[in-house]
Swiss-Prot record:
A GO-annotated cellular component: cytosol
Recorded family membership: Belongs to the calcium channel alpha-1 subunit (TC 1.A.1.11) family. Two pore calcium channel subfamily.
UniProt-recorded name of the protein: Two pore channel protein 2
Localization (cell): Late endosome membrane; Lysosome membrane; Melanosome membrane
Domain notes: Each of the two internal repeats contains five hydrophobic transmembrane segments (S1, S2, S3, S5, S6) and one positively charged transmembrane segment (S4). S4 segments probably represent the voltage-sensor and are characterized by a series of positively charged amino acids at every third position.
Cytoplasmic side of membrane: 1-68, 133-139, 189-203, 292-417, 471-486, 543-564, 678-731
Membrane topology, Extracellular segments: 90-111, 161-167, 225-238, 264-270, 439-449, 508-524, 586-618, 642-656
Gene symbol of the encoding locus: Tpcn2
Length: 731
């Protein structure tokens, strides 16, 4: 394009161009700098079209409104799984009591899905146009995006042509891709997992050898002889055949069925306990923890590579903006030399950048500290480090009172000792609830006398209300609301007050033998339980007042935004496995009396799927499938589910559940532990804390590891800029 052919630097702004052309060029430079800065802040690639029309489209596409709409469309197409056949609209997932669910008519969800696919097609078209044909052909994610859309559209057409009666909908399995491709951090996490797979596979091979060897040894040790009595045969049931033995030891690897597997053999001969102890020591305590260590080490290394790429993108985007905005000076007739970016040139760019007010003010203050002189490249780069820091909020000023009495009261109620008093009162309230729970544990709700507890609730809630009013008086309403703990405390206090007023209006004042009849949707006992539950939650207010607990809580809260990528990967895994499970196991779990495979309740084996009432663990709809997968991921009693599906669906169902265990409990949990450990180690490292500025806090994974990442060299940045297909520099 014409605008792209002109060099961005070195243009003679004093030439005889018409004023409108010079103004258009200057406006284009500003827009280019704005986009480069936004790319740097968001760690986006700068390899896209740079003409005026493309820049407008690019900024519109990455605007908050457009991205939120795209995020909602992704959420909408994923949530369709709860509505589509088989629908999850039943009160219970238990196959014994589940009613016939409402099923949407053919074409309803397909229409919504068509709208979503059309939106994704527009999304792909915009992305493809902005990066250009050359970049599009090299971008595997965009090519995969195109293929997923093609398969989804073809499958959608097949669904309509078969009147929504097709047995398999392939596009459901592909839906999580739309979530993956929209998150750069999820892509990096997935790439890190892929790079870590060889090392995981090596430990997995060791685990497989360990399992096979001990399975063979177990079969040799615990083989049932011809002369064994019936009770001995029952004791050795876990090693009846090779698949049974392998399954038993695999479950024992997760310690889920310990000591169930060991006790039958141990009962016969106490020396057999050594077999299970050695197996558990090698498998669970050594190899599984070795797998955790390897995943932590490998993932951390590959995560550093991904974050190094993000840092390079940040520096490259900032350097591109610097090159666009930098002025040149030099004697007449010589090649002008770069002298830097003037603050008056940069401030209009900063005003147009999509950035929150706090960070803009922080960057402006840093720019003003240069006292009007041009900023050099390193100084310009450091401006955008402010984006990763959350500045400490300045508390609003307290109200000014003239009366000495009011000033004394303000001092008392704003002192931290007043908070300690409130914590003691909250502790007393919690203890009183515990006392009554113990005293009334053997009584039915109708037999309990709630007179004393009701009076205590009134007294404590009255104190909480007075505490709220006193704090508002001392700090002022803006000052009171500036503390998150006060907002949490005040909100619960207001809810408690409203609940108590409703109780008074319906059931009047409490008195001895107070057992009124139920009026409205909630009984007196329900109202009391609701208020006491809120009081228990209110006790969490003590966390900010206990420093070690507050540090742990702040670390966890700071970790939550950085876990979105890991949470997204888990959502993708759940979604795909749930869809596969529905296609494989829908309808295989049948209620008692409907199949010869289902034993009568009286004849069910103790500890079996039927005897434990695990009927809701099925794949008859999407919601039930998610809960079943969750129960398997937790691995508590998961052998019961494995054994049941082996009976109902066949022995090959074990492959599905073992794969899910590997993906969720082994790989994902260990990746989560890796990030959690790194986060805690870094945040609690005294050296790390010394590097933080006073009044700031770390916000992102990139900043968390910034001190151990290598800064890109200027030569590398300039080489990449010169290779930009739509950007032409003079040097």
């Amino acid at each position: 394009m014409a605008a792209e052919e002109q060099p961005l630097l070195g243009r003679d702004r004093g030439s005889g161009q018409v004023h409108s052309g010079a103004a258009a060029d200057q406006e284009l430079c500003i827009d280019q700098a704005v986009v480069f800065i936004e790319d740097a802040i968001k760690y986006r690639s700068i390899y896209h079209r740079m003409d005026a029309g493309s820049l407008w489209l690019y900024r519109w596409y990455y605007s908050n409104v457009c991205q939120r709409v795209l995020g909602f469309i992704i959420f909408l197409i994923l949530i369709l799984a709860f509505v589509e056949v088989p629908s999850s609209f039943t009160k219970t997932a238990d196959v014994r009591y589940r009613s016939q669910p409402w099923q949407p008519p053919c074409g309803l969800t397909e229409t919504i899905e068509a709208f979503c696919l059309l939106a994704f097609l527009v999304d792909l078209s915009v992305k493809g146009y902005l990066v250009g044909q050359a970049q599009l052909q090299q971008n595997l994610w965009l090519l995969a995006y195109f293929m997923v859309l093609v398969v989804s559209v073809v499958d959608w057409i097949v669904s309509l042509s078969l009147a929504c009666e097709e047995p398999l909908r392939m596009r459901r399995l592909l839906r999580p891709f739309f979530l993956l491709q929209n998150s750069s951090m999820m892509k990096k996490t997935l790439k890190c997992i892929r790079w870590s797979l060889p090392e995981m596979a090596s430990v997995g091979l060791l685990l497989a050898i360990h399992l096979c060897l001990f399975t063979i040894i177990g079969m040799l040790l615990f083989t049932i002889g011809e002369k064994d009595e019936a009770q001995d045969q029952e004791r050795l049931a876990y090693f009846r055949n090779l698949p049974e033995a392998l399954t038993s030891l695999l479950v024992l690897l997760t310690t889920s069925n310990n000591p169930d597997v060991m006790i039958p053999a141990y009962t016969q001969n106490r020396a057999f306990a050594l077999f299970f102890i050695v197996f558990t020591l090698i498998g669970s305590l050594f190899l599984m923890n070795l797998l955790t260590a390897i995943i932590y080490n490998q993932f951390r290394g590959y995560l550093m590579k991904s974050l190094q790429t993000s840092l390079f993108r940040r520096r490259l985007g900032a350097r591109a903006a610097y090159e666009v905005l930098a002025s040149r000076a030099g004697p007449a007739g010589t090649t002008p030399e770069l002298v830097g970016v003037n603050p008056e040139t940069f401030l209009p760019v900063l005003q147009k950048t999509q950035l929150n007010k706090t960070h803009k003010q922080a960057i402006m203050q840093k720019v003003q500290s240069y006292e009007g002189r041009p900023m050099l490249a390193d100084e310009f780069q450091k401006l955008f480090d402010e984006v990763d820091k959350g500045l400490a909020k300045e508390r609003p000023l307290k109200p000014q009172y003239q009366s000495p009495f009011l000033q004394t009261a303000q001092f008392i109620f704003s002192h931290h000792y007043f908070d300690y008093l409130g914590n003691l009162v909250a502790l007393g309230n919690l203890l009183s609830i515990c006392v009554f729970l113990v005293l009334d544990s053997d009584l039915l709700p109708g037999e309990r006398d709630d007179f004393v507890l009701g009076i205590l609730d009134y007294i404590f809630i009255l104190y909480y209300l007075l505490e709220l009013l006193f704090k508002v008086f001392a700090l002022g309403l803006p000052g009171y609301l500036s503390y998150h703990s006060n907002v949490f405390d005040g909100l619960l206090t207001i809810i408690l007050l409203v609940s108590e007023i409703c109780t008074l209006a319906v059931y009047r004042l409490p008195h001895s033998g107070w057992k009124p009849e139920q009026y409205g949707p909630l009984s007196l006992w329900d109202m009391t339980r609701l208020m006491n539950t809120l009081i228990v939650f209110r006790f969490l207010r003590i966390i900010p007042n206990i420093k070690p607990m507050a540090e742990v809580a702040n670390t966890i809260l700071g970790l939550i935004p950085n876990l979105r990528a890991f949470g997204g990967i888990l959502v993708v895994a759940y979604y795909v496995f749930a869809m596969i499970g529905i296609n494989l196991f829908r309808g295989v779990i049948v209620p008692p009396g409907n199949s010869s495979l289902v034993p009568d309740n009286n004849s069910a084996v103790c500890g079996s799927f039927e005897q434990l009432g695990y009927w809701p663990n099925n794949f008859d709809d999407f919601a039930a499938a998610l809960i079943t997968l969750w129960n398997v991921m937790v691995v508590n009693n998961w052998q019961v589910i494995l054994e049941a599906y082996k009976r109902y669906a066949g022995p090959w169902s074990m492959v599905y559940f073992v794969l899910w265990w590997l993906v969720s409990s082994v790989i994902w949990i260990n990746l989560f532990l890796a990030l959690l450990l790194e986060n805690f180690l870094h945040r609690w490292d005294p050296q790390g804390h010394k590097q933080l500025l006073v009044g700031t806090k770390q916000m992102s994974v990139e900043l968390m590891f910034r001190d151990i990442l290598e800064e890109p060299k200027e030569e590398e940045l300039m080489e990449k800029l010169h290779k930009h297909p739509h950007l032409h520099l003079c040097r």
